[in-house]
């Protein structure tokens, strides 16, 4: 499999703001992060300059140098030309500029051994000890390791990452995230904003942290407080459009709550522009749904068959896979 970072990526908010003369306001609504996203722009205020060494300890001759735009290092074999397939270490240096003042949570997932310094102070030292197993790195990574740190908005500080492949197998590396600890009522902020707006667009869904290869989805339901967000915004504004951005079917028992629902899937780098085309009435969303969405989870054959026994799932519906299951059992789906 492969992942590609697009050359151009415009968010729906940016596209809507740039293409209309309307007053566009924004509220986060809720937090759906399964794990903390990697540090990147705008918090990452300079590229991560990484020196690789062909040893488990940092030092000596530099085997290779590389620049990264986000704190997400995952390697099958050699990270780059000149570096050993398995025995290596690296030192990465960059600067970060927090967007808000207050407590932040630094999070690490690793397959190997990692030490992180911020402003020349060791914040996480995960070079010794058992940190448990997580789902990331195809099940070879640790559970998230966390620490708190106070940071000031706009104050640029150095961050240094030290990593060793010692003790890791097959997939090596680390992912480092940093996010402010929210003390705001995000749902209330969204509800209040919707109440004083002419119309509301609520974008819900998942991301590659929830839907990815290498493991099953955790749940059939939208993560976080997204259903409550839909309900509260729809109650506050009768002209609410809910945009569902997921890679597969999710619970939609709330489908009659908003004024309109648009399912867009993971549409790629032109998602923002395409969505605005539809919202402004310039294009007709005339596509077909690739999957059937059950009216309730209990109507899905997965409810009966998953997770199975001894890591084996039996497809008990037999030939009635997909829409045939609902047709054969006269089950009216939420979305055909």
Regions inferred by a protein language model and the residue ranges of each:
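Surface-exposed amphipathic alpha-helices with a cationic face
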Residues: 17, 230-238
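Secreted, periplasmic, or luminal enzymes acting at the cell surface/secretory milieu
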Residues: 1-70, 245-336
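Short, well-ordered alpha-helix to beta-strand connector turns
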Residues: 197-198, 237, 258
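Extended, hydrophobic alpha-helical segments in both membrane/secreted and soluble proteins
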Residues: 225-230, 240, 261, 275
């Amino acid at each position: 499999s492969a992942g590609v970072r697009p050359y151009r990526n415009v968010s729906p908010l940016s596209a809507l703001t740039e293409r209309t003369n309307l007053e566009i306001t924004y509220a986060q609504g809720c937090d759906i992060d399964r794990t903390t996203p990697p540090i990147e722009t705008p918090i990452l205020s300079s590229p991560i300059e990484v020196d690789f060494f062909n040893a488990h300890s940092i030092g000596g001759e530099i085997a290779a140098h590389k620049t990264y735009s986000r704190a997400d290092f995952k390697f099958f074999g050699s990270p780059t030309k000149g570096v050993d397939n398995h025995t290596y270490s690296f030192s990465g240096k960059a600067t970060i500029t927090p967007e808000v003042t207050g407590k932040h949570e630094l999070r690490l997932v690793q397959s190997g051994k990692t030490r992180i310094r911020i402003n020349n102070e060791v914040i996480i030292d995960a070079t010794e000890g058992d940190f448990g197993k997580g789902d990331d790195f195809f099940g070879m990574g640790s559970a998230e390791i966390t620490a708190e740190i106070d940071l000031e908005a706009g104050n640029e500080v150095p961050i240094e990452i030290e990593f060793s492949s010692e003790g890791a197998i097959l997939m090596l590396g680390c992912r480092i995230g940093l996010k402010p600890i929210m003390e705001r009522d995000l749902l209330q902020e969204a509800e209040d904003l919707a109440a004083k707006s002419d119309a509301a667009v609520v974008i819900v869904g998942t991301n590659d942290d929830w839907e990815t290869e290498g493991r099953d989805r955790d749940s059939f339901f939208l993560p976080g407080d997204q259903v409550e967000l839909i309900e509260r915004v729809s109650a506050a504004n009768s002209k609410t459009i809910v945009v569902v951005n997921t890679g597969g079917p999710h619970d939609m028992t709330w489908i009659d709550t908003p004024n309109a629902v648009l399912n867009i899937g993971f549409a790629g780098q032109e998602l923002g522009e395409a969505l605005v085309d539809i919202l402004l009435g310039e294009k007709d969303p005339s596509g077909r749904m690739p999957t059937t969405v059950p009216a309730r989870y209990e109507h899905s054959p997965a409810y009966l068959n998953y997770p199975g026994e001894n890591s084996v799932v039996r497809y008990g519906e037999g030939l009635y896979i997909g829409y045939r299951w609902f047709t054969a059992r006269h089950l009216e789906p939420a979305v055909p």
